[in-house]
Regions:
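Glycine-rich phosphate/nucleotide-binding loop
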Residues: 109-136, 216-220, 224-335
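Glycine-rich phosphate/diphosphate-binding loop of Rossmann-like nucleotide-binding domains
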Residues: 15-16, 31-33, 39-42, 143-209, ...
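N-terminal phosphate-binding or glycine-rich loops at protein starts, especially the Walker A/P-loop
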Residues: 1-41
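A glycine-rich phosphate/pyrophosphate-binding beta-strand-loop-alpha-helix module
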Residues: 14-15, 19, 27, 34-35, ...
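Short, glycine-rich nucleotide/cofactor-binding loops
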Residues: 3-15, 141-151, 292-298
């Protein structure tokens, strides 16, 4: 079953989106259908000689990158809406979009609906920690949450870690301002109490910002506001560190020689930290697989997002989440 790729979402749509689709098909053998305006997609496919390899599902409307949830309601035939409809109808196994995060989240909730018992869907990102990756959620879907939602995010993240990362009994950490149980605001304190008593979760307690990349836990739970700020801070820190490193290497012949000798290792480090390599974030808690690629994704990032989506669909992450939620206490739906 193909990936439904929103070809009109992203800073570099549709050209880089189409190029990424071609990479996914030719290099990874992943079937893709492009969803968007027919004429520009046909023109872009012809540049790659791929007009017969990748089908197009027509959707002449698109959400702009600065448009949010309300715009998704006003455009029921937008490319992201049609892509979600394909998954709901069973004609595609997953949705991939580099479009507006708010628009993708709102459209996903409207078109795919939440899994039984889900309070809110959450955006999960995989951090390149050692020895195993760490999942951070929520990374931006819900700026305001209730304590019960953080418990459910822990279940979503645990199911993702088990299915996608093959981690048995993932350890859960709650992001706050101190390791002691009493540290944090009312939301965090109550969430700590609930997580400590939640069956089926290996809750390791509170973690602080400096623990984000240490691999101390397998799943980090927080609200979407804090999670998004943390994620963007890490991305900016990585860019700053590499910029400083380039300047330091230029300072002397010895430094330049050292840079040349370590070039292979530096490239590997850059690859590990490159968002394009990891494919994007995953919107968990819906009746379908949704991958949100970085808005500035080039072809490589789009292709990686398609690979991630196909992998998650094949591993049955949505079903695994449903099983885990069914085994836990089901709260009432809030949306």
């Amino acid at each position: 079953m193909p990936i439904a790729l929103d070809a009109m979402g992203g800073d570099h749509a549709p050209d880089e989106i189409v190029a990424g689709a071609v990479q996914a098909v030719r290099e990874h053998g992943i079937p893709v259908v492009l969803v968007g305006a027919a004429r520009p997609l046909q023109d872009a496919l012809s540049l790659h000689g791929a007009t017969t390899e990748i089908p197009i599902i027509r959707a002449e409307e698109a959400l702009a990158m600065d448009e949010g949830a309300l715009a998704s309601l006003r455009r029921p035939r937008s490319s992201i809406a049609v892509a979600c409809h394909l998954v709901r109808r069973g004609d595609a196994c997953a949705v991939v979009s580099a479009g507006s995060t708010a628009g993708v989240v709102a459209t996903g909730k409207l078109r795919l609906r939440g899994q039984p018992g889900v309070l809110r869907p959450a955006i999960a990102v995989v951090l390149p920690t050692l020895p195993t990756p760490t999942i951070l959620l929520d990374a931006g879907a819900n700026a305001e949450v209730k304590p019960e939602m953080l418990v459910q995010f822990a279940h979503l993240g645990a199911a993702y870690a088990e299915a996608a990362l093959e981690i048995d009994h993932p350890r859960i950490g709650l992001l706050t301002i101190g390791s002691e149980p009493e540290k944090g605001n009312k939301l965090v304190k109550r969430a700590h109490e609930l997580l400590s008593a939640a069956p089926g979760l290996d809750f390791a307690g509170n973690i602080e910002g400096h623990d984000l990349l240490t691999g101390a836990v397998n799943v980090i739970v927080t609200d979407g506001f804090t999670g998004n700020v943390a994620l963007k801070t890490m991305e900016g820190s990585v860019r700053y560190a590499f910029a400083e490193l380039r300047e330091v290497i230029k300072e002397s012949r010895t430094a330049r020689l050292g840079g040349l000798l370590q070039r292979k290792q530096l490239r590997e480090l850059h690859r590990r930290l490159d968002p394009d390599v990891h494919g994007g974030a995953v919107l968990l808690g819906l009746n379908g697989t949704v991958v949100i690629a970085h808005g500035a994704s080039q072809a490589k990032g789009v292709s990686a997002a398609c690979v991630l989506a196909a992998t998650l669909a094949r591993q049955g992450v949505v079903a695994r989440i449903g099983e885990r939620l069914a085994a836990s206490h089901r709260p009432h739906r809030l949306w």
